[in-house]
UniProtKB/Swiss-Prot annotation:
Protein name: Small ribosomal subunit protein uS12
Record's GO cellular component terms: small ribosomal subunit
PANTHER family in the record: 30S RIBOSOMAL PROTEIN S12 FAMILY MEMBER
Organism of derivation: Methanococcus vannielii (strain ATCC 35089 / DSM 1224 / JCM 13029 / OCM 148 / SB)
Stated family: Belongs to the universal ribosomal protein uS12 family.
Amino acid sequence: MSGSKSPKGEFAGRKLLLKRKATRWQHYKYVNRELGLKVKADPLGGAPMGRGIVVEKVGLEAKQPNSAIRKCVKVQLIKNGRVVTAFAPGNHAINFIDEHDEVVIEGIGGPSGQAKGDIPGVRYKVLMVGKNSIRELVRGRQEKVKR
């Protein structure tokens, strides 16, 4: 029989353990997990939600085969100053969001924390505008507080 690279034998345990330890670092998922790269790259820093200030309103074209302009806002996060794009969910929801408003954003729910559906590069959605839920504003159950 041809020899394998792994040691075999009664006392090979430590050698196998050390070999496994060294080989692990060649797997990208292990490296990302051990070094915490997902949290470092995440604008929210691993948190489920984040507060920010609306910088501007933008309309993004939907990816093929759909044809639409998805209403989004650019938000500068308070915790670290990073600017992210967040989707405004609901019919005419963009009308309730003004520049310089404080909003709460959360993940949009795409696969592996990525973009969802036909909105290119948008990983977050607006949850609240000021103290009001965007969903309640769209439904007309709450009114936006005037300053």
